[in-house]
């Protein structure tokens, strides 16, 4: 089944939140490490905005995971 934009944003946001929490990071810490505003990260985690690949890259580096680890959630049923 093909996902729409909203579903993709929501799934990616949930995955980022799960990874952040598993690393014991606050939203403020991750936002700072990734070089973005706290409010932007919040909106990404909530699936409220589509973010750029660059921001996913920055977030993945800050979480010490690969970009595919974040996007693999899109292949889950």
Indicate where each model-derived feature is located:
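Short, charged recognition helix plus adjacent turn
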Residues: 1-2, 69-77
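A detector for short, charged/polar N-terminal pre-domain segments
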Residues: 1-11
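DNA major-groove recognition helix of helix-turn-helix
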Residues: 45, 55, 71-74
């Amino acid at each position: 089944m093909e996902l729409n934009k909203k579903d993709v944003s929501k799934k990616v946001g949930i995955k980022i939140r799960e990874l952040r929490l598993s690393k014991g990071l606050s939203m403020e810490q991750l936002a700072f490490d990734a070089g973005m505003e706290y409010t932007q990260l919040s909106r990404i985690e909530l699936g409220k905005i589509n973010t750029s690949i660059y921001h996913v890259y920055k977030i993945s580096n800050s979480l010490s995971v690969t970009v595919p680890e974040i996007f693999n959630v899109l292949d889950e049923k």
